Amino acid sequence: MEPKSVLISDIYTLIAEQDDKEMKEILDSLKEVFVQGWVRTNRDNGSVGFIALNDGSCFKNVQLVYDKNVLIEYEKLSHVNTGAALSVVGELVLTPGAKQPFEIQVKEFELTGPVDPDYPLQKKAHSMEFLREIAHLRPRANTFNAVFRMRNARAMAIHEFFQNEGFMYIHTPIITGNDAEGAGNTFGIYTEGKNPRTDFFGKEVALTVSGQLHVEPFALAFRDVYTFGPTFRAEHSNTTRHASEFWMIEPEMAFADLNDDMDCIEACLKHCIDVALHRCLDEMEFFNSFIDKTLKDRLHHVLHSEFKRMSYTEAIEELEKAVKNGHKFDNNKIFWGMDLQSEHERYITEQVVKGPVFLINYPKEMKAFYMRQNDDGKTVAACDLLVPYVGELVGGSQREERYDVLKKRMEEVGCMKGLEWYLDTRKYGGCPHSGFGIGFDRLLMYVTGMQNIRDVQPFPRTSDPIKY
């Protein structure tokens, strides 16, 4: 009988789902198996050897056992280096008393892809800085294997949430003629020609900084929509939380106010956390053991917390009270209208609320032109979700649906040119609507405990020189 080609993940799933009575049938059907993967470790004592093989189908490895009395090419296999690609035929044997529930006893093997002895990923601890220098190889390291599995799972969880809630997925353009945030930090696009800035599109264009302005018109046709894609900002911010290319999740909901917006943010975040804790067990156990030993407790706390709501004004009052009582911030000058720093946000969520909190109703000068002005004339219906140990995680707002108010605000900030079409959406059947943005990479940092945005992106793009 030909050996059955199997994935390691399928074997783990089969064994986990069966009881003892069905084990014999499984073993009979998988008596001899064919597996392919990459060597994580290889050790032997001269008579018996052990290889940890990962085939890419799951985070777990499978243990290959090779015996000198059984395998003719024992010496050859014992000298196979970490990182080599291997094809193996062997017998599947259950090992209920060992760390792993099964092993494969090698009968035949083929060295599919040898590896040079100078392979950078040897069996030892490597610094994150070193691993960033070999971004093309680091997916094979345990940490990044787990990170990119989680990146995939988080992306699917986002789509799952919005699709289950009846949202339509909209593809917004990467090339745009506007700067949605009005900050001017865009990457211009040029062509070869006499007028490289304008020859192709007839005007200056850039890579998008946000899909929001382009997804809003679709909310006014399909009610609930979202976009999920890459965005670009030419900021020279050499921090652990900033990148020049990153992914954004940006939903928009018609006939929704700020409270509806916050309800959706809370539900979305809790869904992502729930999926991580209950469907990504191996990866989460790894992160909790080796990256952040408080990770699972923190996520469980957020999952089961009520997200409180506090006005920006109340937050300023709490910070002023803290300073008066002797608390020292790096920026101790607290005043209404200031842009809160991470230390202030963390104080509010960790010391005052002791849990997740939405800060709402910010001064309008601090926020984008499209946010709905409140009746006081000083604030806008905006919200930022603050979570312990991170600070701001999500930003959202009710959008200004009143044509005259929005037009006046756009004229005040000088962004009318090129956005006449955006104003049209308020002239022709506009309605109250709200939306928010989640930085996908920062969300991934939060769920994994990773401390640098460069370590949750496959090939990070920052203001550093590009190698890949």
Name the predicted role of every residue range.
Residues 2-18, 24-254:
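Class II aminoacyl-tRNA synthetase-like tRNA-binding/catalytic domains
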Residues 38, 80, 156-165, 210-213, ...:
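Generic, well-ordered alpha-helical scaffold segments in large soluble proteins
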Residues 78, 150, 179, 183, ...:
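Secondary-structure capping and boundary motifs in well-ordered enzyme cores
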Residues 120-122, 151, 168-175, 229-230, ...:
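Short coil/turn segments at secondary-structure boundaries
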